[in-house]
Design a protein with these regions (language model features):
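Short amphipathic, basic-aromatic surface patches that mediate peripheral association
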Residues: 36-49
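A short, Gly/Thr-enriched small/hydrophobic beta-strand-prone motif that recurs across taxa
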Residues: 24-38
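Glycine-rich, aromatic-bearing surface loops/beta-hairpins
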Residues: 119-168
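C-terminal motif of bacterial Sec signal peptides marking the signal peptidase cleavage site
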Residues: 14-17
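Positively charged n-region of N-terminal signal peptides that target proteins for export
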Residues: 1-4
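Bacterial signal peptide processing site
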Residues: 19-22
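Tryptophan-paired
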Residues: 52-116
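Short coil-to-beta strand junction motifs in C2/discoidin
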Residues: 28-29, 47-56
Length: 168
């Protein structure tokens, strides 16, 4: 009887020590949405419309091999506005440690845009640079800021979506 009690006590203690609380989980916030519009506010990501960027590709500039494609999704809102949704996939390079013990990483992506100028012709491909900086701490891994062609287009605001609009 003592052996059974001892075994049950050990099993109970083992199970209790393996439990974790919600506070120990790291929040992941790395979804980034990119809108591209002209100076009048017109959507330039409509996939079939003349004057829009009908061809888009993302290429990882920090990958060990050349021309490594990075996946993204072209999505549409209820009002028919298109945007590019990027979740992950590009190489993350360590940049620095922060004063609070966190770490900063970055991904560098070449964004190739092909504009449809007529039913049968496309303009030359435009190649832009997208840099996404991430902040990592024990509590959170999140997009902290984004540069597009070396211009700051996004800075993280707590509990807000990661969204930037580029004017071309």
């Amino acid at each position: 009887m003592k052996k059974i009690f001892l075994i049950l006590t050990l099993i109970s203690l083992t199970l209790l020590s393996c439990g974790s609380d919600e506070d120990s989980l790291q929040k992941i916030d790395q979804l980034f949405n990119l809108y591209i519009k002209d100076s009048s506010g017109n959507d330039l990501l409509k996939p079939t419309e003349i004057g829009s960027y009908t061809g888009v590709s993302f290429t990882d500039q920090l990958a060990e091999k050349d021309n490594v494609n990075v996946s993204y999704n072209r999505k549409m809102l209820a009002d028919s506005t298109y945007y590019l949704e990027y979740l992950a996939g590009a190489t993350r390079q360590f940049v620095e440690e922060t004063s609070d013990g966190g770490k900063i990483y970055k991904s560098e992506i070449r964004v190739s845009l092909t504009k449809k100028i007529s039913d049968t012709q496309n303009a030359p491909v435009v190649q832009d640079k997208l840099e996404i900086f991430y902040r990592s701490s024990p509590n959170v891994f999140e997009v902290s800021r984004v540069l597009y062609n070396n211009q700051l287009v996004f800075t993280k605001v707590p509990d807000q979506p990661n969204v930037a609009t580029i004017i071309k």
